[in-house]
Each structure stands twice: as structure tokens, then as C-alpha cells.
Amino acid sequence: MAPKVFYISDGTAITAEVFGHAVLSQFPLEFESLTIPFVETLAKAEQVKRQINDCFITTGERPLVFHSIVKAEIRDIIYSSEGVDYDFLNTFVAPLEQHLGVSASPVVHRTHGKANHGYEARIDAINFAMDNDDGQTMKHMDQADLILLGVSRCGKTPSSLYLSMQFGIKAANYPFTEDDMDNLKLPEALKRNKKKLFGLTIDPVRLHEIRQSRMENSRYSSLKQCRLEVKEVEMMFKRERIPYIDTTNHSVEEIATKILDVTGLERHMF
């Protein structure tokens, strides 16, 4: 039976999930999880406590409980459950207060709430990424922090959206298609912003598999076409001295982190 995990918060529970996933990923196990956000009242906390206790009664195993709860009275109710508590927020606050010489002033929803200073940057960047996805328009390239290039289905769109959502980076992306292969070159709008260009490439066999799932047995998805496009685009990256990375078998989080590391782009938010 898969171990049971609860992610609980008086906010969005995103922080509890991220922390919990990071820790549990170190173990070669499958977990069954339940996320419970916005536990903002004593009544809701008691309800969650009953869920945790019922889980213990049903399985005979104490569930893991990762939580980031600001209000002490709500946190105490969760503490009194039959779960194994991992309160990472409170674990780090006291030592930091001692080190910084300043008392914390906890506020619910501060981390992922609208009042957070990075909220507007996040929304602007997300809108920019969607408006400038897949070469829809070349009018706003001057406003981009980053322009991702590559063949179709190499990871440009998810990387652009992740960079915008997670770091507030205005990322556009531009695809090189089958029609470009005979005379592959940078459009003028990209040449003007060459310092912002960053390439993504991918193993042709993996690209073939991805395209097959969308357009099976087509010229677009053929291994021959995938090999041709990847080869031509990589040659252009080298010719134009555009930095690039291989996205094969990497998660969007890993791709985004590598891009930031190579480019030195500053995160606009955390």
C-alpha cells in the first residue's frame, strides 16, 4: 500500500507541496497524496484532523503531513492529529529570528498572494509568454527578456510559460519548421535581439516519438525529418553562436534552471 501524504495550508498549499515533493522525491516509493488548501478556520482544521485520523484508522499507518500554517491555533489542531508532522515553516522561523534578531510577522497568503510584490510581474510575464508563443507575432521581441528557438515540439512553449510563471521572465519563443530547412536563417526581428536568443535542441529519436503521438505516420513526425531538422537547427545555432542546451529527458524545471544558469538572467521574482 502506498504511504499516504497530506499537504495542508491556510493558504494555497503550494509551498507545502513543493517542500514535500522535494523531500519525498529522494525515496524510491510511490505516494498517495491529498492537498487541502485554505484551512483558515478552527472548524476546517478540526475537519482536516478527522480526515488524517480516519486515514490512520483505515490504513493502520500514520500518514505524513506536510504543512505551512501561519496561525498557531490552527497549527496546534493539526499537531494533535495522528499524522507525522513536518512543519517546515515553523522549523526554520525560530532559528532565523535568533540569527536575524528580528521577530517574524506571519501573514496568511503572503507567499503566493496577490499582495506579493512579484504578482504583477508574474501576470505581465505570463501574458507576454502567451501572446508571443510559437512565433505568433514578431512585434514585441524588443520587450522580451529571452527568446527561445528550436524545432517544433522540443520544449519551447512549456519552458517559456514556466519561466514566466515561476520567475516573472518575459520569454518569447520562435519555431523553425520544415519550410525553413532549405534556407535556414534568423528573421530580422531575431537578428536585432541576438543577445536574447537561446536555443533548445532534442534527440531526433525522442522528437520522433513526441511527434508520432500528435501526427502519427506523417512526414512531420518521420524520423528522417526529425533528424534533418535537428541537424540543420543545431548547425545554425553554432554558425550564429547562439547558446543552446539539449532538452532530451529533462523536466521543464531542469530546462528552465539550465537556461537561467547559462544566460545569467536575473529572476524577477521568487
Swiss-Prot record:
It catalyses: [pyruvate, water dikinase] + ADP = [pyruvate, water dikinase]-phosphate + AMP + H(+); [pyruvate, water dikinase]-phosphate + phosphate + H(+) = [pyruvate, water dikinase] + diphosphate. It comes from the Bacteria. ADP binds at residues 150-157. Pfam families: Kinase-PPPase (PF03618). GO terms for molecular function: ADP binding; ATP binding; phosphotransferase activity, phosphate group as acceptor; protein serine/threonine kinase activity. Keywords: Kinase, Nucleotide-binding, Serine/threonine-protein kinase, Transferase. Bifunctional serine/threonine kinase and phosphorylase involved in the regulation of the phosphoenolpyruvate synthase (PEPS) by catalyzing its phosphorylation/dephosphorylation. This is Putative phosphoenolpyruvate synthase regulatory protein. It comes from Shewanella sp. (strain W3-18-1).
